[in-house]
Amino acid sequence: MKILKRTDIEAIGNRVYTAYRKLPKIAEQNMICAVDPDILLTDLLGLRVDYRHLSIDRRIYGTTSTGAIRVMLCQEDSQEDLYYLDGKTILIETDLQKDSLMAGKCRFTKCHEASHHIYKMLYPHFYGNNNEGIDPVLHFSREPEKRTGIITDWEEWQADVLASCLLLPEELVRQGMYQIGLGEKVECLNRIYCPDVYAKVNTLAQMLGSSITALANKMQRHGLLERNQLYDPYAYWGVYFDIPPNCKWTDPREIKQAYMNQKYGNNK
């Protein structure tokens, strides 16, 4: 397997997005729209998407292979279903398609599995199993386990990174920020102190079919967001203070005054 840096993967994602934008169905769009994984997979990459129950506990979200192979699918009645993957097909868990709350996970899983095919197209001699007489590699996308910060599977990590680049390419994010009135850079994303900016970023995330968390991380990655305080909305200029129990403050000015009182005394 070829080991790629994040910057290398982002460059691949940009190339794929450029080709995607030239597709007839996409080129005629005038407004900023979310990347459509189905058009990307079928019209650009020549892949086919099918839906099946992939496991009894539904913890396998997707599977694919860049070569022809038969895969055994487990059904609820414990019956085994033999499915033939032809090297151009991506299987997605049916429940992801049916549940509207899993729409984001469904989009990501499609692009994750498609990423394996993109790497195979770009690096045919370094990716997958090329030895005759040995079955091709079967890729699985599973329910994520607790993150430890340690990469244990570089192949799946690279597929995750490319999937993120395909769904939120830098060019699309910049265009969306300009269109929605965020300018070239957001100084601080904080729902308490910067509610107007937060509302715009949240609207942009919905436009791009993303969560606000994923969009904020992408913006920060590309230097489009200075301070990401989604998980720290009560941090005032990066300084922390104790919030009394059963606090009902809603006005940022009250929080600011509490910070000033705690730091400098009630007379300030």
Language-model features, listed with the residues they occupy:
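Active-site hotspot residues in diverse enzymes, especially metal/ion-binding acidic/histidine motifs
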Residues: M1-K268
